[in-house]
Amino acid sequence: MKVTFQGNEVTLQGKEVKVG
């Protein structure tokens, strides 16, 4: 999971999600 939070990206479980 790629999560964007305050301009930062986190990859988790190979999926992509955008937050904020």
UniProtKB/Swiss-Prot annotation:
Instruction: Provide the alphabetized UniProt keywords.
Output: Antioxidant, Oxidoreductase, Peroxidase
In terms of superkingdom, the source organism counts as Bacteria
Q: What is its EC number?
A: 1.11.1.24
- Is Oxidoreductase found in the keyword set? yes
Does the keyword Oxidoreductase feature in the UniProt annotation?
A: yes
Catalysis performed (reactions): a hydroperoxide + [thioredoxin]-dithiol = an alcohol + [thioredoxin]-disulfide + H2O
Q: Mind listing the GO molecular function terms for this protein?
A: thioredoxin-dependent peroxiredoxin activity
Extra remark beyond the main annotation: On the 2D-gel the determined pI of this protein is: 4.6, its MW is: 20.2 kDa.
Say what the protein does: Thiol-specific peroxidase that catalyzes the reduction of hydrogen peroxide and organic hydroperoxides to water and alcohols, respectively. Plays a role in cell protection against oxidative stress by detoxifying peroxides.
Q: Assembly and partners?
A: Homodimer.
What does the sequence similarity comment in the record state about its family? Belongs to the peroxiredoxin family. Tpx subfamily.
Q: What is this protein called?
A: Thiol peroxidase
The UniProt gene name for this protein comes to: tpx
